[in-house]
Amino acid sequence: MKHFKLYIVAFFCILFSAEIYAEDVTYLTTEQFKTRVFDYTKNKQWKYEGETPCIIDFYTTWCGPCKRLSPILEELSEEYCGEIVIYKVDTERERELAAAFGITSIPTLLFCPVEGRPQIAKGLLPKEVLKQAIEEVLLKK
């Protein structure tokens, strides 16, 4: 019984410490997208609403390449914690948003710098290519 209690305590310590340090990918609804990224219903010209550059992953739950991209984005979220934000938009749940951006292929990534126009990349890209895009498009290094 004593060992069981120790395991429980250790489990919760690990669980909470992982949550404190991990920068998670955030899932967005259409309404959240409008306030955090761009309100396409009110503005015709692109105006990024965020203070930190972001990547938006337009995906679906059944898409094989989307599933392979997800852990890469999680890793990048941790590597660039505080420098960029990574959002995910489920195109089947947020059809209006996907249609507004002309998303016809998944995964599609939208790279949004704080200043300037966003850039789109389609398909499953290697981590190194994504890192290069983050450095050049979002962080302007």
Regions found by a protein language model. Name each.
Residues 17-18:
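N-terminal signal peptide c-region/cleavage motif recognized by signal peptidases
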Residues 1-8:
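Bacterial N-terminal signal peptides that target proteins for export
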Residues 89-100:
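Structural microenvironment flanking redox-active thiols in thiol-disulfide oxidoreductases
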Residues 51-54, 58-62, 105:
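Short pre-active-site segment immediately N-terminal to redox-active cysteine/selenocysteine motifs
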Residues 105, 110-141:
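Non-catalytic, surface beta->alpha helical segment in thiol-disulfide oxidoreductase systems
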Residues 51-53, 68-89:
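Conserved helix-turn-beta segment immediately C-terminal to the redox Cys motif
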Residues 58-72:
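Conserved redox-active cysteine motifs that mediate thiol-disulfide chemistry
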Residues 28-52:
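A short beta-strand-turn-helix
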